[in-house]
């Protein structure tokens, strides 16, 4: 009998978030795929710190783990509803958007049916001998105590380690022992009571997570006379853009277009496109305003402040009062102001990291000039095309990287490379619009030199003034962008 150390799998997946779990579900019925998936957690949990009562996911139920690749899969969200006796109630509810807790329950339902998942495995190193990778993992018991080391061998690696919470520089080394909490949104529910007990709360950042926490706290904060501030460096509290032609940017065609752009232009577009998936749902924006209107009836003065164009630049702990002294800079006026707060919630997003366990592979892993994974169009990071990435490619592939609905498409691409065939049909075109230059109207390099400025010919006059530039392009500096933070589905999807 083969042991884990001697058996050679087709795939070893590292990380079991929604994207890794989706790939595991899609690989399960394939007879020519031998896969195993490892995760350091003891079970599947999807952002437990943000399971706010009544919160919904921001994408329709079709954007589940598998449906966009295989609508007939037994692992679909509709199959989960049928199995749990909730299909007809969901139908009568007449909403495309599942409850967030329900989506987490669905993912755990899928995980329970897969025998390829290995929990309590912390990967410590990956090495390669010829064409075979060896993944070494520490195995822990339910209490986190180390039991043993295991090795798994495979021809392909799937990196689904996802993203890590980010705190602003001003908060990273703040002394918090014995005082009110300074937390990332990912830990919100664990500290909700302590936040309200601190006497005053400041939420830093914009986007869906910040908005949900503000809405969850405002009634209790007013009832308990707790000041609640919401501060963002964005010029306003951006709604998420969810129009249909904009949604076509989550398409293979736009991904091809984005991937082919120069690095500096991709960086610029990445900042400009944050409202596509890091903004606030329009319904929640309206609910917050309606709530403030309700709470202020009778001329009541609310103990809350919503401050845009305000960037956190410094923070310190005042031992004499136990409060935090926060300094902000108004980016429009270039003026600073101070606020005191008993606790702080940072809604400033997540970022991808290059896993340390890849270090033994050295130069086999492609990195860009900023030290990030240099992910190919087909989601690989080595020249052999055998190390694949899930949700670590936003800087190379754009808005499709964190999108739940695009996950099955990416998994289909990965599985086609692993199997050498197309087990799930891969759509090449889905958008009505064209991104880039249309094929039937392309002009050869240098052909513009032959054009004359007469009779409606192309105007190639240089753009010399700022007004000229702004009339042609919608460029904005980083100060006018939404704070980098997760919308709960389009980014909060640790693979």
Language-model features: locations:
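Short, solvent-exposed beta-strand-terminating loops
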Residues: 45, 58-76, 237-240
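Glycine-rich phosphate-binding loop and adjoining beta1-alpha1-beta2 segment
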Residues: 47-61, 280
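A conserved beta-strand/loop capping segment in the N-terminal third of enzymes
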Residues: 68-101
């Amino acid at each position: 009998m083969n042991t884990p150390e001697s058996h050679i799998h087709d795939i070893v997946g590292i990380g079991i978030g929604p994207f890794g779990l989706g790939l595991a579900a899609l690989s399960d019925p394939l007879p020519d795929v031998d896969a195993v998936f490892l995760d350091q957690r003891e079970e599947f949990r999807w952002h437990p710190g943000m399971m706010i009562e009544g919160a919904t996911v921001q994408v329709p139920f079709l954007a589940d783990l598998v449906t966009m690749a295989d609508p007939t899969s037994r692992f679909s969200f509709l199959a989960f509803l049928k199995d749990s006796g909730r299909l007809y109630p969901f139908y009568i509810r007449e909403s495309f958007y599942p409850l967030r807790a329900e989506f987490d329950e669905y993912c755990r339902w899928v995980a329970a049916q897969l025998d390829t998942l290995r929990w309590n495995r912390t990967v410590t190193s990956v090495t390669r001998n010829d064409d075979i990778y060896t993944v070494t993992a520490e195995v822990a018991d339910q209490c986190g105590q180390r039991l043993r080391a295991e090795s798994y061998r495979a021809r392909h690696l799937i990196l689904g380690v996802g993203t890590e919470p980010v705190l602003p520089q001003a908060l990273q080394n703040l002394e918090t022992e014995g005082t009110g909490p300074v937390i990332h949104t990912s830990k919100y529910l664990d500290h909700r009571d302590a936040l309200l007990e601190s006497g005053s709360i400041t939420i830093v950042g914009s986007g869906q997570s910040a908005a949900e926490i503000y809405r969850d706290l405002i009634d209790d904060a007013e009832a308990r006379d707790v000041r609640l501030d919401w501060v963002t460096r964005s010029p306003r509290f951006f709604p998420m853009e969810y129009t249909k032609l904009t949604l076509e940017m989550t398409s293979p065609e736009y991904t091809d277009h984005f991937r082919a752009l120069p690095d500096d232009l991709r960086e610029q577009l990445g900042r400009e496109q944050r409202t596509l998936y890091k903004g606030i749902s329009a319904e929640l924006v309206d609910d917050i305003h309606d709530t403030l209107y309700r709470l202020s009836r009778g001329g009541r003065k609310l103990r809350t402040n919503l401050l845009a164009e305000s960037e956190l630049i410094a923070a310190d702990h005042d031992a004499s009062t136990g409060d935090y002294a926060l300094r902000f800079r108004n980016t429009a006026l270039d003026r600073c102001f101070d606020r005191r707060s008993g606790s702080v919630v940072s809604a400033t997003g997540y970022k991808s990291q290059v896993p340390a366990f890849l270090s033994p592979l050295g130069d086999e892993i492609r990195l860009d000039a900023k030290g990030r994974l240099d992910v190919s169009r087909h989601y690989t990071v080595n020249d052999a095309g055998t190390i694949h990435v899930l949700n670590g490619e936003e800087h190379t592939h754009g808005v499709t990287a964190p999108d739940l609905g695009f996950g099955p498409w990416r998994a289909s691409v990965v599985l086609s490379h692993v199997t050498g065939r197309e087990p799930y049909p891969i759509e090449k075109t889905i958008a009505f619009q064209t991104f880039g230059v249309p094929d039937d109207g392309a002009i050869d390099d240098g052909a513009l030199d032959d054009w004359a400025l007469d009779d409606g010919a192309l105007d190639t006059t240089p753009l010399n003034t700022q007004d000229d530039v702004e009339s042609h392009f919608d460029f904005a500096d980083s100060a006018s962008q939404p704070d980098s933070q997760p919308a709960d589905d389009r980014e909060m999807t640790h693979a």
